[in-house]
Amino acid sequence: MKELKVSKINNGTVIDHLPPGRALKVLRLLGIDGSEGFMVLIAMNVYSKKLGGRKDIVKIENVYLSDEQTKALALIAPTATINIIRNGEVVEKRGVTLPDVVEGILTCPNSSCISRSKREPIKSKFLVVSKRPLKLKCHYCGEIIEEKEVSNYINLR
């Protein structure tokens, strides 16, 4: 039996069951580059019974994800599980859920889209056309974003 030996965190967030190779994208999404001063643990390509193969894990001490960050995480890692840790114990465990409509998280790739106009106070709005594979359609101009490119358009302010 394989055993994972990664340090525990006392307080913070564990993002588990990430598809292999996504841990670094998750850190980029969260704006974490290592200079913040809090502990970040990354395990990549470790064995997972749940996923039937490999997975990545990210542990972030003393950091908790906002609702917006959780929604963005669902766009790049729909199989992720978020564990909230307090005093060394898991106090909450939840999967991420991709909503049917994604608002204000993505930038439309179409430079002419009204949602990109600085003069219009309009949040971007994408309809989820397909969850697997992920395919999103801009509500305003109809531009399509495919799964492989979605992380390029995530814009958390």
Swiss-Prot record:
Gene Ontology MF: a single term: metal ion binding
Residues spanning the signal sequence: none
Keyword tags: Metal-binding, Pyrimidine biosynthesis, Zinc
Pfam families associated with the record: PyrI, PyrI_C
Cofactor annotation: Zn(2+)
Positions that bind Zn(2+): C108, C113, C138, C141
Stretches assigned to coiled coil: none
Gene3D superfamilies noted in UniProt: Aspartate carbamoyltransferase regulatory subunit, C-terminal domain, Aspartate carbamoyltransferase regulatory subunit, N-terminal domain
Bound cofactor: record note: Binds 1 zinc ion per subunit.
InterPro entries named among the record's database cross-references: Asp_carbamoyltransf_reg_N (IPR020545), Asp_carbamoylTrfase_reg (IPR002801), Asp_carbamoyltrfase_reg_C (IPR020542), Asp_carbatrfase_reg_C_sf (IPR036792), Asp_carbatrfase_reg_N_sf (IPR036793)
GO cellular component: aspartate carbamoyltransferase complex
Biological processes annotated in GO: 'de novo' pyrimidine nucleobase biosynthetic process; pyrimidine nucleotide biosynthetic process
Subunit structure: Contains catalytic and regulatory chains.
Function of the protein: Involved in allosteric regulation of aspartate carbamoyltransferase.
The family this protein is said to belong to: Belongs to the PyrI family.
PANTHER family named in the record: ASPARTATE CARBAMOYLTRANSFERASE REGULATORY CHAIN
Protein name: Aspartate carbamoyltransferase regulatory chain
Organism name: Ignicoccus hospitalis (strain KIN4/I / DSM 18386 / JCM 14125)
